């Protein structure tokens, strides 16, 4: 089965975790697309640029280049990966035709890497998108604020969108946004959201398990 995996930029803040993800992906025999977030590098550079008065577009560009740097690092750990980081969907598809593993970061200002991951999943006709996130599942409310928040193992995109719009989900924008949801809904691609600190959850999904939250159309 074709896999598309969205790696939170926070994964790249833990050296051992990066290597663990590389091992899991190398062990998988099928085709894999990976989209990396910008992480701490992006946040730091954007903060400095914002303080200096840079436009939102310029701040987005810094985040994009940070995510591409993470992508290039990840490529260096994967023998079967395309050695070039695609910068748009056309370049991604070109690499996809030639390589077993293709890794990319952001594409353009105003577009999250969550949307990039959705576009990639759509373009390669992947049945599922695996989101290694900075939370372990989707909750009805922020569990840090409300300890009684309900963990939601299965939900629809419509239900998930309502939770996002209520602004109670931690890391919501990084997790998914309106554009990414619309792309995934129109293709009926199933998304699995799980704790990004546990790369073994990729293997769990492949075994038919649900280690976090499963979002369907």
UniProtKB/Swiss-Prot annotation:
Protein name listed in UniProt: Uridylate kinase
GO molecular function terms noted in the UniProt entry: ATP binding; UMP kinase activity
Primary enzyme class: transferase
Keywords from the named record: ATP-binding, Cytoplasm, Kinase, Nucleotide-binding, Pyrimidine biosynthesis, Transferase
Repeat in keyword set: no
EC number from the UniProt entry: 2.7.4.22
A GO CC term assigned to this protein in UniProt: cytoplasm
Underlying gene: pyrH
Localization terms from the record: Cytoplasm
Superkingdom classification of source: Archaea
Reactions mediated catalytically: UMP + ATP = UDP + ADP
Binding site for ATP: 6-10, 39, 43, 134, 139, 142
């Amino acid at each position: 089965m074709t896999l598309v995996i969205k790696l939170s930029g926070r994964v790249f803040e833990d050296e051992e975790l990066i290597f663990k993800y590389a091992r899991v992906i190398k062990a998988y025999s099928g085709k894999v697309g990976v989209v990396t977030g910008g992480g701490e590098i992006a946040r730091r550079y954007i903060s400095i640029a914002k303080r200096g008065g840079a436009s939102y577009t310029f701040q987005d560009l810094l985040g994009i280049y940070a995510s591409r740097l993470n992508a290039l690092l990840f490529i260096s750990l994967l023998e079967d990966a395309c050695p070039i980081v695609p910068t748009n969907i056309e370049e991604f598809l070109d690499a996809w035709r030639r390589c077993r593993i293709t890794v990319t970061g952001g594409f353009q200002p105003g577009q999250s890497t969550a949307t990039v991951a959705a576009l990639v999943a759509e373009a390669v006709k992947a049945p599922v998108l695996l989101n290694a996130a900075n939370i372990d599942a989707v909750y009805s409310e922020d569990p840090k604020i409300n300890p009684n928040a309900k963990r939601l193992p299965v939900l629809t995109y419509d239900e998930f969108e309502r939770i996002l719009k209520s602004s109670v989900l931690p890391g919501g924008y990084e997790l998914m946004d309106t554009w990414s949801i619309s792309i995934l809904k129109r293709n009926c691609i199933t998304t699995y959201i799980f704790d990004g600190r546990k790369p073994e959850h990729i293997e769990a999904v492949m075994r038919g398990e649900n280690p976090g939250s499963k979002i369907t159309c």
